[in-house]
């Protein structure tokens, strides 16, 4: 059964875990080690080229992931783009979580307060262009 490696800055929700188990047949979820999670969650905005910055994350995937494992990739747009292409090159399956936004307006004391909730819908593959 495939594993799911997690390149994003949150914890999986119960809905995401259940969906991955049921529809993707994932049996194990692999979060990045703390130091790599810090890298992924803090991509520097002032660096022109982030290839060297992402190298430790790529090395982690090369060491631990096997072809047809899933990689959930969400975050900085440039880092996501690079890691999606890396995953495809390594015969991994890059995916992202789709969500439905539910907004509710509350009128109180002459003010409008909007509460937004995001509900997981499904995982979608990043497909090569």
Swiss-Prot record:
InterPro entries: MJ1673-like_dom (IPR049811). This is Uncharacterized protein MJ1673. The lineage of its organism: Archaea, Methanobacteriati, Methanobacteriota, Methanomada group, Methanococci.
């Amino acid at each position: 059964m495939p594993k799911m490696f997690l390149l994003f800055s949150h914890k999986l929700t119960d809905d995401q875990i259940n969906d991955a188990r049921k529809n993707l047949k994932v049996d194990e979820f692999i979060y990045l080690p703390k130091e790599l999670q810090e890298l992924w969650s803090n991509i520097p905005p002032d660096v022109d080229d982030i290839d060297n910055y992402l190298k430790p994350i790529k090395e982690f995937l090369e060491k631990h992931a096997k072809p047809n494992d899933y990689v959930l990739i969400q975050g900085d747009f440039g880092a996501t783009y690079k890691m999606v292409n890396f995953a495809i090159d390594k015969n991994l399956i890059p995916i992202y979580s789709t969500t439905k936004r539910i907004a509710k307006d509350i009128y109180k004391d002459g003010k409008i307060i909007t509460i937004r909730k995001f509900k997981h819908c499904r995982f979608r593959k990043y497909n090569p262009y």
